[in-house]
A protein has these predicted regions:
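Conserved catalytic or regulatory cores that recognize and/or transform ribose-phosphate-containing ligands
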Residues: 1-103
Length: 103
């Protein structure tokens, strides 16, 4: 199962955002998930619109969405959760994906 990792990026340095997302990605991978992480494919200089187009396209290639803490404070993450939900994908906190019966 491939999970898209969603969370706040704005207000963080690129280095902080990468660390935040990669920590969650490493944990999810250790539980057997494949992951898609926006900081891996969106250039730090991309406009918000360009970033969201790339993120939504990648999200739709995934099977579920793993939400990082603070996602509700991010307009982009809220949009990603709405798209995932509208498309019938499970959207849960990262920790919820780690429970035995999560997948």
């Amino acid at each position: 199962m491939r999970l898209y990792v969603s969370g706040p990026v704005s207000g963080k340095t690129h280095h902080e955002a990468v660390g935040y997302f990669e920590s969650a990605a490493k944990l999810l991978v250790s539980y057997g998930y494949a992951v898609s992480v926006p900081t891996r494919f969106v250039e730090p200089t991309a406009s918000h619109a360009t970033a969201m187009r790339k993120c939504i396209a990648e999200l739709l290639r995934c099977d579920g969405l793993a939400m990082l803490p603070g996602w509700r404070r991010s307009a982009g993450a809220c949009l990603e959760v709405a798209v995932a939900t509208a498309c019938g994908m499970d959207a849960k906190a990262v920790e919820a994906w780690l429970e035995r019966d999560a997948s």
